[in-house]
């Protein structure tokens, strides 16, 4: 560690946000919220919009810690974590390996399966294969295997004659995953403990707008589900956090088909840098267990280190 975060009463924090991924707007919102909370907690916070000159700016600023509020590619996939390790600047959230692994949905699911966690059937297919025929019986979901925030996600409903026309900016290889009907559940893990289960209620598909537009979804916490399903979500989220090697906070998303009871539960993905916007799930879950937003942000900073 180049600088000892714990030895300073109020470390100088670089709030790294923005970046160039498709999730830039979400990242800016998270960064602004966290920056304001940390300033209220007495920290010196410097806003840092990550761009091509990031390494030089970090060397000039010489922060005691980097709060990584980036989302999506480059900021959440191990790339910027590697830069911070190289510069020996303590940083928040997961390290290089866990970030890269969790960002790759196919490898994440392989890690889940190896740990005995329940998953939905899925595979990687080219755009040409998807366009030519159904690669699995509908309903199924098409999504990039290395993006978050439901960017570029398509739901192919039961009875559809063909897959939808895909946006030109999507990659050539995509994940296709069997759609699990029912409810969307999610669990935040802080350190090594699960906080609670939230049931995400929407009018339709839980897409980008449902996640980030006020009123786009309703969050019920604690989720009103059977006790064995609730306990399984909590335990599975902790296991996912551990087997992926996550640090700090993570959030694991599930689908649950109530018709199949506990057998209807499937892990979708683990987010190593959960959103911290006004409509985000992780701050709500922390508040539910008595940890206010400012205290959560403080904990994240105090947890920062190198060699994560």
Curated annotation (Swiss-Prot):
Residues bound to Mg(2+) 2: 269, 271
Cellular component, GO annotation: cytoplasm
GO terms for biological process, alphabetical: cell wall organization; peptidoglycan biosynthetic process; regulation of cell shape
PROSITE patterns: ATP_GRASP (PS50975), DALA_DALA_LIGASE_1 (PS00843), DALA_DALA_LIGASE_2 (PS00844)
EC number, UniProt record: 6.3.2.4
Sites where the protein binds Mg(2+) 1: 253, 269
InterPro entries: ATP-grasp, ATP_grasp_subdomain_1, D-Ala_lig_Van_CS, D_ala_D_ala, Dala_Dala_lig_C, Dala_Dala_lig_N, PreATP-grasp_dom_sf
Protein location: Cytoplasm
Keyword field contains Magnesium: yes
Pathway: Cell wall biogenesis; peptidoglycan biosynthesis
Main localization (coarse): cytoplasm
SUPFAM superfamilies: Glutathione synthetase ATP-binding domain-like, PreATP-grasp domain
Binding site residues for ATP: 136-186
Alphabetically ordered keywords of this record: ATP-binding, Cell shape, Cell wall biogenesis/degradation, Cytoplasm, Ligase, Magnesium, Manganese, Metal-binding, Nucleotide-binding, Peptidoglycan synthesis
Cofactor stoichiometry and binding remark: Binds 2 magnesium or manganese ions per subunit.
Keyword Cell cycle set for record: no
Residue span(s) of domain ATP-grasp: 109-302
Family the UniProt entry places it in: Belongs to the D-alanine--D-alanine ligase family.
Function: Cell wall formation.
PANTHER family named among the record's database cross-references: D-ALANINE--D-ALANINE LIGASE, D-ALANINE--D-ALANINE LIGASE B
Designated name of the protein: D-alanine--D-alanine ligase
Higher taxonomy: Bacteria, Pseudomonadati, Pseudomonadota, Alphaproteobacteria, Rhodobacterales
Gene: ddl
């Amino acid at each position: 560690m180049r600088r000892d975060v714990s030895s300073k009463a109020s470390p100088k924090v670089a709030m790294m946000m923005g970046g160039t991924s498709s999730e830039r707007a979400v990242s800016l919102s998270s960064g602004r919220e966290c920056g304001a909370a940390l300033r209220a907690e007495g920290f010196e916070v410097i806003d840092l919009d990550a761009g091509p000159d990031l390494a030089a700016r970090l060397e000039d600023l010489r922060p005691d810690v980097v709060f990584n509020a980036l989302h999506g590619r480059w900021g959440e996939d191990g790339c910027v974590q590697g830069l911070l390790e190289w510069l020996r600047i303590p940083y928040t959230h997961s390290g290089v390996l866990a970030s890269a692994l969790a960002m790759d949905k196919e490898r994440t699911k392989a890690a889940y399966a190896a740990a005995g966690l329940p998953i939905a059937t899925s595979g990687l297919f080219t755009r040409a294969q998807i366009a030519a025929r159904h690669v699995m019986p509908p309903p199924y979901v098409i999504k990039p295997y290395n993006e978050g925030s439901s960017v570029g996600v398509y739901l192919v409903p039961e009875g559809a004659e063909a897959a939808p026309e895909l946006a030109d900016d999507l990659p050539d290889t995509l994940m296709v995953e069997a759609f699990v009907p029912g409810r969307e559940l999610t669990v935040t893990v802080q350190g090594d403990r699960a906080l609670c289960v939230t049931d995400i209620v929407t009018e339709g598909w839980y897409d980008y707008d449902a996640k980030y537009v006020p009123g786009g979804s309703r969050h019920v916490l604690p989720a009103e589900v059977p006790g064995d399903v609730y306990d399984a979500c909590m335990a599975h989220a902790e296991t996912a956090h551990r087997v992926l090697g996550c640090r700090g906070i993570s959030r694991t998303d599930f689908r649950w088909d109530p018709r199949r009871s506990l057998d209807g539960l499937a892990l979708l993905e683990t987010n190593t840098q959960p959103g911290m916007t006004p409509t985000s799930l992780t701050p709500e879950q922390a508040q539910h267990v008595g940890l206010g937003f400012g205290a959560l942000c403080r904990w994240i900073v105090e947890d920062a280190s190198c060699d994560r």
